[in-house]
Amino acid sequence: MTTFKLVISDPKSGIAKQIEISGANAEKLIGKKIGDQIPVKELGLDLKALFGKDFPEDVKMEIRGGTDKDGFPMRPDIHGPRRVRILLSKGPGFRPKEKGERRKKTVRGNTISPEIVQVNVKLVY
């Protein structure tokens, strides 16, 4: 049985809430990629109870990233659910200390798999 920590951010209010989903709702996320949008109704979440305000009926969640079981971040430019070691100069998974610095870092692909533990999403309405 798959379990995900789902970090839901509301960009209009600047509030983020973390919940845990498992079972059939978590299985619906497997195979989705960064940038995909999922209707909130599909996961059966009650946003009013979480955020304390009403949302439109057609509100969706856009996947923005996540981390795997060992803490490696997902990158939108690496395709598939694989873990790779790539040379990075900027972006998710690397913060350069000097101008022009590049390093090899391990990152996760852009597809959600059972090895992913945390999924970051933002509300789109």
UniProtKB/Swiss-Prot annotation:
Coiled-coil region: none
Gene this protein is translated from: rps6e
GO BP: translation
Protein name: Small ribosomal subunit protein eS6
Keywords, in A-Z order: Ribonucleoprotein, Ribosomal protein
GO cellular component assignments: ribonucleoprotein complex; ribosome
TM segment ranges: none
Similarity field: Belongs to the eukaryotic ribosomal protein eS6 family.
Keyword set includes S-adenosyl-L-methionine: no
A single MF term (Gene Ontology): structural constituent of ribosome
